[in-house]
UniProtKB/Swiss-Prot annotation:
GO MF annotations in UniProt: RNA binding; structural molecule activity
Other facts: Most abundant protein in the virion. Since the viral RNA genome consists of 15,383 bases,there are 2564 molecules per encapsidated genome.
Region annotation (Ntail) ranges: 405-517
Organism expressing this protein natively: Sendai virus (strain Enders) (SeV)
Primary residence: virion
Location(s) in or outside the cell: Virion; Host cytoplasm
GO CC annotations on file: helical viral capsid; host cell cytoplasm; ribonucleoprotein complex; viral nucleocapsid
Gene for this chain: N
Name of the molecule in the record: Nucleoprotein
Binding site for RNA: 180, 190, 195, 260, 350, 354
Region described as Interaction with the phosphoprotein: 462-471
Function of the protein: Forms the helical nucleocapsid (NC) in a ratio of 1 N per 6 ribonucleotides, protecting the genome from nucleases. The NC has a helical structure with either 13.07 N per turn, approximately 20 nm in diameter, with a hollow central cavity approximately 5 nm in diameter. The encapsidated genomic RNA serves as template for transcription and replication; encapsidation by N is coupled to RNA synthesis. Forms the encapsidation complex with the phosphoprotein protein P. Before encapsidation, the newly synthesized free N protein, so-called N0, is chaperoned by P.
Residue stretches spanning the membrane: none
Span list, region Ncore: 1-404
Length: 517
């Protein structure tokens, strides 16, 4: 029997391993698009020229008349300016199945009178039309930087702070846009400026070089459409984290920004490990959690097999990233969220109202986390030399802290119906309930079933299953009728009264105002 159980325990991991591993066969390359990237040649030495080219790249990346692939190419050109060898940077980090980068050099010819003396060329030939296209007149629909609105002079900044600091300010902001475009695209502007504040306070980004809101939105739209650009930036982070130690100040700032996108899209997976497994509470021994624990073990193996790219599997759209969704281990995730909302107040704002939430496990997690005995780690008792007296006093303090908080937290957000918990035991067979009329209200029970909260009115149902969400077309009397019907069904034997030990109240929020009784 032990061998049989062992086989079942390892099935999930072996199954994932067989799916993810290559089965051999011929490698057939896919179609790749060509993206032009411009790098500075050795003849461009003046810092003012370099900053001008950087702002030119930025302006082209915001030109809505160009294709997104071209705009992405200009952002790549801008990012490559941070390195003394842009070609090596692209060779190391730019290998991509979707695009092929074609590199053009920008040189400065003092004899040229047009295009500010710049010329686009390769080893074999010069590209006059491309030069005109790149350095010709442009009509910016909005300023690139907030300093342009304040009549600030970038040349003054260049003389004061130097070219590396000015270029670094621009590139760091591009990276911040990447972070917010991926993690919170709906609030891109607000998120960008909130994240930027720390870099403004430490002087990394000067006020005159702060992007305008239009610039932020323009760069964000390109990043959301160009996965190859996102992949290049992620590979840049991986290279800096693993292959080098002599990082420049700009690269260190990029690493700081990059930390915000580590494990992006994996919050549920990480929180399940943190609150569901690492707390090491006795509830993990439940048999109905065992399949999810095996699944989580398999996912951990998959995560570790990805090496330094593991924190970015969602950003890189790795085919396995969907396996990490909490719907694949709902019971364990629900239990972990129950523990989390008790142990960490910030987690009470986390969206737990998912359709796959296991309410029983969610309540169990809260109950276990509230239990003073469960809060004491027996594994550390001997290591720390904790005496029995100290443990007893600790239990006493924990009981005092949590003694007045008997309420359970309800799931928040999401598309699921919000559920609140009530500790009171309710006897459905009392005479008052038996005499309820078709409206479902009876004497004192009316106060129990409906209440006014924060100026809004909620109709509540004790011990109910999921109800259809009410709309503006449903009137209050119809809602009450539905409640009465459900209560009548339960009195007929669907739920026995003595089994109603944990009262579950489903709050159906109505958008209309309930008439006052």
């Amino acid at each position: 029997m032990a061998g049989l159980l062992s086989t079942f325990d390892t099935f999930s991991s072996r199954r994932s391993e067989s799916i993810n591993k290559s089965g051999g066969g011929a490698v057939i390359p896919g179609q790749r698009s060509t993206v032009s990237v411009f790098v500075l040649g050795p003849s461009v030495t003046d810092d003012a020229d370099k900053l001008f080219i950087a702002t030119t790249f930025l302006a082209h990346s915001l030109d809505t008349d160009k294709q997104h692939s071209q705009r992405g190419g200009f952002l790549v050109s801008l990012l490559a300016m941070a390195y003394s060898s842009p070609e090596l940077y692209l060779t190391t980090n730019g290998v991509n199945a979707d695009v092929k980068y074609v590199i053009y050099n920008i040189e400065k010819d003092p004899k040229r009178t047009k295009t500010d003396g710049f010329i686009v060329k390769t080893r074999d030939m010069e590209y006059e039309r491309t030069t005109e296209w790149l350095f010709g007149p442009m009509v910016n629909k909005s300023p690139l930087f907030q300093g342009q609105r304040d009549a600030a002079d970038p040349d003054t900044l260049l003389q004061t702070y130097g070219y590396p600091a000015c270029l670094g300010a621009i590139i760091v902001q591009v990276w911040i846009v990447l972070v917010k475009a991926i993690t919170s695209s709906a609030g891109l502007r607000k998120g960008f400026f909130n994240r930027l504040e720390a870099f403004r306070q430490d002087g990394t980004v000067k006020g005159a070089l702060v992007f305008t809101g239009e610039t932020v939105e323009g760069i964000g739209s390109v990043m959301r459409s160009q996965q190859s650009l996102v992949s290049l930036m992620v590979e840049t982070l991986v290279t800096m984290n693993t292959a080098r130690s002599d990082l420049t100040t700009l690269e260190k700032n990029i690493q700081i920004v990059g930390n915000y996108i580590r494990d992006a899209g994996l919050a549920s997976f990480m929180n399940t490990i943190k609150y569901g497994v690492e707390t090491k509470m006795a509830a993990l021994t439940l048999s109905n959690l065992r399949p999810d624990i095996n699944k989580l073990r398999s996912l951990i193996d998959t995560y570790l097999s990805k090496g330094p790219r593991a924190p970015f599997i969602c950003i890189l759209k790795d085919p396995v990233h969907g396996e990490f969704a909490p719907g694949n281990y709902p019971a364990l995730w629900s239990y972990a969220m129950g523990v989390a909302v008790v142990q960490n107040k910030a987690m009470q704002q986390y969206v737990t109202g998912r359709t796959y939430l296991d309410m029983e496990m969610f309540l169990l997690g809260q109950a276990v986390a509230k239990d003073a005995e469960s809060k004491i780690s027996s594994a550390l008792e001997d290591e720390l030399g904790v005496t029995d007296t100290a443990k007893e006093r600790l239990r006493h303090h924990l009981a005092n802290l949590s003694g007045g908080d008997g309420a359970y937290h309800k799931p928040t957000g999401g598309g699921a119906i919000e559920v609140a918990l009530d500790n009171a035991d309710i006897d459905l067979e009392t005479e008052a309930h038996a005499d309820q009329d078709a409206r479902g209200w009876g004497g004192e029970s009316g106060e129990r079933w409906a209440r006014q909260v924060s100026g809004g009115h909620f109709v509540t149902l004790h011990g109910a299953e999921r109800l259809e969400e009410e709309t503006n077309d449903e009137d209050v009397s119809d809602i009450e009728r539905r409640i009465a019907m459900r209560l009548a069904e339960r009195r007929q034997g669907i739920l026995q009264p003595m089994e109603m030990k944990a009262a579950i109240t489903v709050w159906i929020t109505t958008k209309m105002t309930m008439p006052q009784q």
